[in-house]
Amino acid sequence: MMRKQLISLLICGVLATTAVAGLAGCGGGDNSSITPTETTVKLTLWGASEHQTMLGEMVTAFKAANPNTTYEITLGVCSEADAYTKLSTDPSAGADVYAFANDQILNLNRVGALARLGGDNLEAMKSANGEGAVNAAKIGDGYYAYPYSSDNGYFLYYNKSVVTDTSSLDAILAACQTAGKKFVYDLDNAWYDAAFFFGTGCTYKVTYTADGKAEESVACNFDDATKGVAAGKAMINLAAHSAFMNGGDDELKAGFADGSVAAAVSGTWNATAIQGSLGDNYAACKLPTFTVDGTTYQMSSFAGYKLYGVNPYSDFLAEAHKLAAFLSGEAMQQKRFETFEIGPSNTNIAASEAVKANVALAALAAQGAYAVAQTAVPSGFWSAVETFGLEVCAKTVTVENLSEKLKTMGDSIRSVANS
């Protein structure tokens, strides 16, 4: 359960020896090793909708591993992408433990939604995970999350009986068109649209205030007359192709299942479903190139991590840390890999033969050479690029007004939300 105010405001310094949650707020120190005194520990855990069954099994395993404590753990639905949105207005009303994508870590910290790790929890997290994942949990000189996945990126899935040349977007679209099938791309999703802009060389850079909690300035050239225009034209061309279908996870999985889709861009979380649909024709590889006005570009992508955050407003802070550590531990990362082929951040599992032989993870690794780390993303990026993508899909962005639309997007990205 969550309280509107940290319990420390009421009893810190008065019942210092027993008020565990209160100590979490006194002085801002780490309390991840404190043991709660309550008989029944009540926690709320947020996770993606498609992971609810698996999370229920993980919670059962957690309870079995801690038989001397009585837990009441409630599951809630919140995708990793939506964690900051749900917590930004009132983190005290949020879950005790929640999953999030690493690009949100600064904003989550800014609104006070992340408890700092310390003691054995910190040392275990740092020793078990890869360097990139550990750094994704870091803000300044502290660590504020538990990594559980290093596969937050995307690549190409395809039916190899239909698509035989995956080197270029044109070749993929032509193969789909000839076979009367579709290529699915989430063109009104900023996360995927970045592939075109990064591919043509567009960049951004955020300068933060000294405490890391606010944007001081944002530089961005997504509206560049050459690079930005090339990316925009590529998106316009894709949206106009008869073999293109705009869609996300549900559309591409349904399309592979019924045979109407022959290629799609997504991540490892859909590997099991797509492989089940395609069988022997299942294949995956890095993203293709695209050509605009005679110049060929390699599609880029975001590369990121997924982590568990612990809400400092938890009434059972130490137990919330214990749950987050368990869910991100080696055994549960192994379960995620076996259930959804989610790429582990745990170094032992990542080095296993099963992971090395995985088709989707191999494709993700190949795409990694062209990926941009999903860190320090401007706060205005997501809504601005999504709006541009929506307009491309609606065909209200044309070659004639492209520069104007790009400038509107660029100005929105460069705006500093906290100024």
Range-by-range predicted roles:
Residues N102-Y154, S167-L173, A283-K286:
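Hinge/lid segment of periplasmic solute-binding proteins
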Residues S88-T89, A93-D96, A124-Y158, K181-Y185, ...:
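A structural signal for short loop-to-beta-strand junctions that line the ligand-binding cleft
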Residues G212-N246:
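Glycine-centered hinge/linker elements that transmit conformational signals in sensory
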Residues Y144-Y148, Y154, I172-C220:
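Extracytoplasmic/periplasmic solute-binding protein
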Residues A365-S419:
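Conserved C-terminal helix/tail region of periplasmic/extracytoplasmic solute-binding proteins
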Residues L108-R116, G140-G142, C202, I274-Y297, ...:
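Ligand-binding "clamshell"
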Residues G276-T339:
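Extracytoplasmic/periplasmic substrate-recognition and gating elements
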Residues S8, A19-V20, C26-Q104, D411-S419:
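Conserved N-terminal structural module of periplasmic/extracytoplasmic solute-binding proteins
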